[in-house]
């Protein structure tokens, strides 16, 4: 499927062909820190609305596709990884990218069956049809930048109909953030093995805020629920957090729960775990 968009024509962009081989996965810090994606595998059509200080975010999806999910965002992690790898190697990059589906699927830890390919196309459809309005990186905090996660994408084939891969165009907002080295972090490849939406979202938040600080970081449950954009009730969300602490499945980090003196409010703590101590 090829989805159109009122963006500037494809021919005005240079083509960036995906690089072969393994590379470290990189993620955009803005996407790690704020609620841009649905955390549910079921279709979500309720908009995500988030405001904190000068930061405003509104994410909307269509009735047909719903809002792009945190699993769909793996494609953006692949794109960011490609762009950073090429930039560091002195290779010219572009918002217009071409790749073979199996290259993307392999990188994000998926299978390469027909069903996996169909799921990849469905993810691309959700990324293209999801609209975002945000004040992040807008200097006044009052102006909103509006875009879709993918401006457009299409399947390629030769004259005989033999598949040649896919092309996609990334939005300026995402592309500019990835090119800024200060706005990108390397993530653990084990992230792609995480199966839960809240689990995946929490890893990205922990990686963004905890980094490699020896003392770690902490957030109260109420703040985490608000920052996740989750539609889960606070009680259910808290249960999910407690289950994650009990499971200790977060790559590179150890989670804990403490209660605030006086209020008794639960606080999630996290700190880096030395590689030798990771199971």
Label each region the model flagged.
Residues 1-279:
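Charged, alpha-helix-forming regions
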């Amino acid at each position: 499927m090829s989805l159109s968009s009122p963006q500037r024509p494809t021919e005005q962009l240079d083509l960036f062909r995906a690089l072969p081989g393994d590379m470290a996965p990189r993620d955009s810090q803005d996407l790690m820190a704020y609620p841009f994606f649905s955390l549910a595998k079921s279709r979500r059509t309720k908009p995500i609305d988030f405001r904190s200080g000068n930061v405003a975010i509104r994410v909307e999806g269509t009735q047909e596709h719903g809002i792009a999910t945190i699993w769909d965002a793996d494609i953006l992690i692949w794109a960011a990884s490609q762009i950073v790898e090429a930039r560091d190697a002195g290779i010219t990059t572009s918002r217009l990218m071409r790749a073979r589906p199996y290259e993307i699927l392999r990188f994000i830890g998926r299978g390469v069956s027909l069903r996996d390919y169909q799921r990849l196309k469905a993810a691309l459809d959700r990324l293209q049809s999801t609209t975002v309005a945000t004040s992040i990186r807008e200097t006044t905090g009052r102006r909103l930048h509006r875009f879709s996660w993918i401006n457009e994408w299409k399947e390629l084939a030769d004259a005989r109909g033999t598949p040649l891969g896919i092309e996609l165009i990334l939005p300026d907002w995402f592309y500019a953030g990835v090119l800024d080295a200060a706005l990108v972090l390397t993530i653990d490849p084990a992230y792609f093995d995480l199966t839960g939406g809240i689990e995946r979202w929490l890893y990205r938040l922990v990686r963004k805020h905890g980094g490699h600080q020896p003392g770690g970081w902490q957030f109260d449950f109420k703040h985490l629920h608000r920052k996740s954009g989750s539609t889960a009730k606070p009680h259910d969300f808290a249960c999910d957090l407690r289950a994650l602490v009990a499971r200790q499945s977060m790559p590179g980090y150890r989670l804990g729960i403490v209660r605030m003196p006086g209020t008794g409010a639960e606080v999630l703590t996290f700190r880096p775990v030395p590689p030798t101590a990771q199971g």
